[in-house]
């Protein structure tokens, strides 16, 4: 049987999509998948870091809107779906060890530890369908790419050992669409809400839009302006500075697709 096309994947209900991912039949980005369902960034930390990270999320709700937290040792997010297993249900993960480059894998069962605490953080992929419903085109989806993400000069509010830059995702739009996008996304605070910035990227420390720190470059037309949303990759930038001995995250753009609708929580 041939592998499903991306358009076919986009029509699948989340449990079916997760089954494909769990079997290793899909390992690509999730922008455009799940239709109107919440997507989540993932952070998995040893319990000794969990309280600090929980407070970090509370202090930085635009970048880290918390959707669910697992019990220590549990790989499940009961609030987001009955059969979710965070060890296998994301297309791609990053395993981070102190002093080493992250390793990307498609399953983290072999790395799981009894004191791990998993955090699900809202993702802007969740409101992309609402933008499309409003007639707003999304260039990265039109090109079949991941969204472009950048480390900005906007500082997060620190929590203990955790401090660092806010990562932002960028979507180019014409001015009229930008106004409508602000109106639409402001309704969804659990998926980063309205943009943090629009216009000149140098004002938030971004020198070259053609060279994103994460994801894929997305071209900007002459009559468009860039809009920047807070991004759930922010914890990866912050944890890279804090240097826990071990933590696991999603690979940027490769999210957990939940059973919850984006306007349900």
UniProtKB/Swiss-Prot annotation:
InterPro entries: D-Glu_cyclase, Putative_hydro-lyase, UPF0317. The keyword Isomerase does not apply. Disulfide bonds: none annotated. GO terms for molecular function: lyase activity. Keywords: Lyase. Its EC number is 4.2.1.-. PANTHER family: D-GLUTAMATE CYCLASE, MITOCHONDRIAL. Belongs to the D-glutamate cyclase family. This is Putative hydro-lyase PSPA7_3193. It comes from Pseudomonas paraeruginosa (strain DSM 24068 / PA7) (Pseudomonas aeruginosa (strain PA7)). The lineage of its organism: Bacteria, Pseudomonadati, Pseudomonadota, Gammaproteobacteria, Pseudomonadales.
